[in-house]
């Protein structure tokens, strides 16, 4: 009555396999789905390390590295967003692997919500590696005939270190996820006034920045926070375009 389908995509050029799963309710009653991951992988090698990425403003995607042992190693986010605070991408590499040597397996979710990634040795020192939507606060109601699809996971392997793995992810994301006119073109250059002025700006200051930027070949100026209403510091409210512009015409 319940059917699980596994979906694999093979991108030979990029050395990537994608994996997702679908659960279909063909029964007569509704079900509550409380946990469903994008992949679960069993590995024979004994001594893995997990590399994951956390961070904050001005210190984005800081790599941290910990050994995988019999106690479960688990990272994730339940904030509803991922971004550079806790990135939904992890690497499982052999002990001591570096940029140009050692085997490593990457896993990246095409999803920016709550996620979990876990690895653990079993009693025979084999490693189970899993990743998907975080089960905390997750409950999906499936009526008869309905289905649930997990986010897609992008899996890649390198036998020659982390640099090759990174390059393979660059390629798959550039070729198959990035969209728009600038997918394979140089992007226009823009300048943002925020770090130069913060909230303290007027028309004269903005025009001076624009004039200097134009001389350098910069093609666009982005007017940042503070152009609307009475927002003169970070403690005041944010607003929208309906507010009267306070500093520039």
Predicted regions and their residues:
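Conserved, mostly hydrophobic/aromatic
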Residues: 21, 145, 191
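Short acidic, Pro/Gly- and aromatic-enriched capping/linker segments at domain boundaries
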Residues: 127-141
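Single conserved hydrophobic/aromatic residue that forms the stacking wall/gate
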Residues: 237-249
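Terminal connector regions
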Residues: 162-176
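Aromatic-lined carbohydrate-binding/catalytic grooves of carbohydrate-active enzymes
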Residues: 184-239
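Short Pro-Gly-centered flexible turn/kink motifs
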Residues: 140-159
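Short, basic/aromatic beta-hairpin or loop at an interaction surface
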Residues: 119-129
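Polysaccharide-binding surfaces and accessory modules of carbohydrate-active proteins
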Residues: 1-120, 136
């Amino acid at each position: 009555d319940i059917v699980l389908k596994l979906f694999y995509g093979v991108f030979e050029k990029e050395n990537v396999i994608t994996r997702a799963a679908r659960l279909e309710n063909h029964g007569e009653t509704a079900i509550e789905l409380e946990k469903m991951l994008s992949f679960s992988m069993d590995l024979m090698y004994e001594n893995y390390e997990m590399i994951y990425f956390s961070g904050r403003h001005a210190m984005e995607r800081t790599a941290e590295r910990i050994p995988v042992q019999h106690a479960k190693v688990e990272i994730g986010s339940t904030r509803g967003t991922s971004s550079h605070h806790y990135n939904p991408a992890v690497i499982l590499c052999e002990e001591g692997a570096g940029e140009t040597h050692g085997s490593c397996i990457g896993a990246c979710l095409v999803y920016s919500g709550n996620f979990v990634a876990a690895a653990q040795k079993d009693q025979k020192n084999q490693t189970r590696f899993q990743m998907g939507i975080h089960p905390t606060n997750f409950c999906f109601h499936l009526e008869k005939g309905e289905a649930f699809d997990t986010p897609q996971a992008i899996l890649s392997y390198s036998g020659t270190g982390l640099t090759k793995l990174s390059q393979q992810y660059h390629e798959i994301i550039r070729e198959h996820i990035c969209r728009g006119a600038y997918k394979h073109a140089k992007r226009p250059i823009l300048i943002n006034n925020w770090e130069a002025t913060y909230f303290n700006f007027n028309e004269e200051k903005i025009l001076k920045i624009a004039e200097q930027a134009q001389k350098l070949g910069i093609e666009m100026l982005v007017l940042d926070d503070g152009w609307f209403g009475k927002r003169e510091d970070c403690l005041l409210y944010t607003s929208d375009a309906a507010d009267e512009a306070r500093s520039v015409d």
